[in-house]
Amino acid sequence: MRSATIVSAVLFSAFSAVHLIDDFLSGVPGEFNLTIPITLLLSFAYMLALVGLIVAASCRSPTSYLGLTIAGLLIFLAQLLKSIPEMIRPGSWHLGLPSEIAAIGLGLSAGMTAVCSYLAWRATRHADRRMS
């Protein structure tokens, strides 16, 4: 399950980067009254945390599996509750089809990461119990 976790998390980070760029180009930070420097700082912190969790997961850290589960679940829910309803409204969303592909890819990869990471976390816990 560790390999599936790493692969899905790498996809999650790739779609996150693309979606962040799309959000910048579409003026999303302005919707939340965020300045460009603050938005850049938040983007940096998000990507640093996500990549850090992937690195830790590659070392079989149970805590990183739990962190990726939570991150994946939160982003999956954000896409489901915010982006999908906006996309199904009439008219184009953000920059059209490329934006929609990025948002759907982000949601799916985040969901896959949440599931795979949770299963890896459970497997790690069960292995630890057997060792005790």
Give residue spans per PLM region:
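N-terminal signal-anchor transmembrane alpha-helix
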Residues: M1-G30
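Interfacial segments of alpha-helical transmembrane regions
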Residues: M1-L11, S61-G72
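Structural motif marking the loop-to-transmembrane transition
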Residues: M1-R2, I6, P37-L40, T63, ...
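Membrane-water interface at the C-terminal end of transmembrane alpha helices
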Residues: R2-A4, V55, L106-M131
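Core segments of alpha-helical transmembrane spans in multipass integral membrane proteins
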Residues: A14-V18, D23, T35-C59, I70-L73, ...
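Short hydrophobic alpha-helical membrane-anchoring segments
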Residues: S16, L20-D23, S83, L119-R122
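Interfacial non-cytosolic loop connecting adjacent transmembrane helices
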Residues: G27-T35, Q79-I104
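Hydrophobic alpha-helical membrane segments
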Residues: L66-E86
